[in-house]
Amino acid sequence: MEKEKNKKFDSSSFKKEEKSNLAWKKEAKATKEIIKKDDEMEVVTEESQSKNEGNFKARRKVKKVISKPKTEFSEKIVDIARVTKVVKGGRRFSFSAFVVVGNKKGKVGYGHGKANEVPDAIKKAIKDAQNHLITVPIINESTVPHEMSGKFLSSKVIIKSAPKGKGIIASGAVRAVMELAGYTDIYAKSYGSRTKMNTVKATVETLKKMRTVEEIAALRGLKVQDIIS
């Protein structure tokens, strides 16, 4: 009898945890859309005066919605996860966000943020990404100058140039980096660990190794024509 009771108790607690996981995942998806609107609009409170019949001036607060100036950088949320910390008093929940930021003109970076709420975690991740931007070379306004491979831990990425009009042929995590960096025609293949965070970091490490013909010529002390020929 005791074993049966324990089984019932375990199954019910498991179902509760499963429901809570589904709930926060839905909330995370909703906040992705809300945070975009919050970034575009700003609510400003102003005080205005109105005259009453008895020559008495009353103040009231008026809310005005003002559009924020758009920045050249755009972001993509790669991953949102709920973090559980077991302490003496029980469990403490927080959220972590992993974001890629770029201006689609050769600058890209990734960032990580952690907070008690999803929007705060995303904002922290965006700030972290903006502080760790790198400049990457873009040839013919569409592709990389040459083939290159890179790795981060057990994740490996190979990037190749593609003809104009081919598009970005890559997985979701690699595609996010390529689009925000400004590439439009790319072949990319990922190997090893397929976790989104490690794949993004491996992609950025690969892009760091890219060099234009002019840069290679300067490093070798040669002319561009000598390298091309």
Swiss-Prot record:
Superkingdom as given in the UniProt entry: Bacteria
One biological process term in Gene Ontology: translation
GO cellular component, one term: small ribosomal subunit
Keywords of the record: Ribonucleoprotein, Ribosomal protein, RNA-binding, rRNA-binding
Region (Disordered): 1-27
Annotated ranges, domain S5 DRBM: 73-136
InterPro entries: Ribosomal_Su5_D2-typ_SF, Ribosomal_uS5, Ribosomal_uS5_bac-type, Ribosomal_uS5_C, Ribosomal_uS5_N, Ribosomal_uS5_N_CS, Ribsml_uS5_D2-typ_fold_subgr
Pfam short name (any one): Ribosomal_S5_C
PANTHER family: MITOCHONDRIAL RIBOSOMAL PROTEIN S5
Family statement drawn from the similarity comment of this UniProt entry: Belongs to the universal ribosomal protein uS5 family.
Note on domains (UniProt): The N-terminal domain interacts with the head of the 30S subunit; the C-terminal domain interacts with the body and contacts protein S4. The interaction surface between S4 and S5 is involved in control of translational fidelity.
Record's function text: With S4 and S12 plays an important role in translational accuracy.
Complexes and interactors: Part of the 30S ribosomal subunit. Contacts proteins S4 and S8.
Protein's name in the database: Small ribosomal subunit protein uS5
Organism, scientific name: Mycoplasmopsis pulmonis (strain UAB CTIP) (Mycoplasma pulmonis)
Biological classification of the source: Bacteria, Bacillati, Mycoplasmatota, Mycoplasmoidales, Metamycoplasmataceae
Gene from which this protein is expressed: rpsE
